[in-house]
């Protein structure tokens, strides 16, 4: 049995956190389109989107999710980062509001469930409610993320 502290053991249902903010930039949208191959006019055609219900181009939903996971990673301590064994997945993903170039997002989380694991790598899984909010305090993305921790 290890005497090292366990991040999993210290994680409790109801734990909450809020990350710092991050502004979604023109470069983010352009680079994400290139990396993902998603050149949909929603993200790339300013003239077309100016006449749409959104009034301007919107950021890719998965770009916002990716930026949110980055903010969550940056918010972890070195010990918490070392304790991450695997990212298991995302459930109940919803895009609540559009995110525009220039919007600043932050992530709010609450631990919903911890589940011990008897075998294999890691001590257990943590299921977390995740809400991405913009500078107007609107929820733009919501989901549940599950992570395997030591």
Enumerate the predicted regions with their spans.
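Generic structural detector for well-ordered beta-strands
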Residues: 18-23, 94, 146-148
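Core FKBP-type peptidyl-prolyl cis-trans isomerase
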Residues: 62-65, 123
């Amino acid at each position: 049995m290890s005497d090292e502290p366990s991040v999993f053991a210290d994680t409790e249902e109801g734990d909450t956190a809020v990350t710092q903010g991050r502004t979604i930039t023109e470069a983010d949208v352009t680079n994400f389109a290139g990396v993902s191959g998603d050149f949909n006019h929603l993200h790339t055609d300013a003239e077309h989107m100016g006449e749409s219900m959104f009034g301007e181009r919107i950021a890719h939903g998965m770009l916002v999710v990716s930026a949110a996971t980055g903010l969550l990673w940056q918010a972890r301590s070195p010990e918490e980062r070392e304790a991450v064994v695997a990212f298991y997945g995302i459930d109940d993903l919803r895009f609540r509001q559009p995110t525009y170039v220039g919007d600043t997002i932050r992530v709010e989380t609450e631990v919903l469930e911890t589940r011990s694991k008897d075998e294999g790598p890691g001590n257990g899984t943590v299921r977390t409610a995740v809400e991405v909010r913009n500078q107007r305090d609107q929820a733009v993305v919501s989901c549940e993320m599950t992570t395997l921790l030591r």
